[in-house]
């Protein structure tokens, strides 16, 4: 934590191929050890696979998948009177997209397809159809928030 004040976030530049900031953020989440070109080629190959399999515009399928993966509620731990409570809170928009991208990439990495572009493409297609592991994760988070609804009055 810096002592000299608030550090401003740098603006993410739009992706040159699809002209979308969300695609750039996905490339950043895919990137390992700063290898942006590798991450970009994986993503563009995945988008080509999505277009071949669905016959739709890959950016539209990806945005639909993101809407199905992004959480609305989550729980945060708060200590009250010596015991920890899981308090449901609404997720800020920036965190929603970050969590959605993180879950999409992490569950794509756990899939069993041969290459990463196939894994990512199939996870995006599954998420756009409201199936897949990333959507299941969102449902689990929402279920947890719903189960702890009784503690919502504690506010964070």
UniProtKB/Swiss-Prot annotation:
Keyword annotations from UniProtKB, A to Z: Ribonucleoprotein, Ribosomal protein, RNA-binding, rRNA-binding, tRNA-binding
Where do the coiled-coil regions begin and end?
none
Classification via PROSITE patterns: RIBOSOMAL_S7
Task: Name the InterPro entries for this protein.
Answer: Ribosomal_uS7, Ribosomal_uS7_bac/org-type, Ribosomal_uS7_CS, Ribosomal_uS7_dom, Ribosomal_uS7_dom_sf
Extract the Pfam families matched here. Ribosomal_S7
Which one GO biological process term can you cite for this protein?
A: translation
Superkingdom to which the source organism belongs? Bacteria
Indicate whether Cell wall biogenesis/degradation appears among the record's keywords: no
Recorded hits in CDD domains, A to Z, give: uS7_Bacteria
Q: Name one GO molecular function term.
A: tRNA binding
What does the function comment of this entry state?
A: One of the primary rRNA binding proteins, it binds directly to 16S rRNA where it nucleates assembly of the head domain of the 30S subunit. Is located at the subunit interface close to the decoding center, probably blocks exit of the E-site tRNA.
The record's note on quaternary structure and interaction partners says: Part of the 30S ribosomal subunit. Contacts proteins S9 and S11.
- What name has this protein been given in UniProt? Small ribosomal subunit protein uS7
Give the source lineage, highest ranks first.
Bacteria, Bacillati, Bacillota, Bacilli, Lactobacillales
């Amino acid at each position: 934590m810096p002592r000299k004040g608030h550090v401003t976030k740098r603006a993410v530049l739009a992706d040159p191929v699809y002209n979308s900031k969300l695609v750039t953020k996905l490339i950043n989440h895919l990137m390992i050890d700063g290898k942006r070109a590798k991450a970009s080629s994986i993503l563009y190959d995945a988008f080509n696979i999505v277009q071949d399999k669905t016959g739709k515009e890959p950016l539209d399928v990806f945005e639909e998948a993101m809407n199905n993966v992004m959480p609305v509620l989550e729980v945060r731990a708060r200590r009250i009177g010596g015991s920890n409570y899981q308090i449901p809170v609404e997720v800020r928009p920036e965190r929603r997209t970050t969590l959605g991208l993180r879950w999409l990439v992490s569950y794509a990495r756990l899939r069993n397809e041969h290459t990463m572009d196939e894994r990512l493409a199939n996870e995006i297609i599954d998420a756009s159809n409201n199936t897949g592991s990333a959507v299941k994760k969102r449902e689990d988070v929402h279920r947890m928030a719903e189960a702890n609804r009784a503690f919502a009055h504690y506010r964070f």
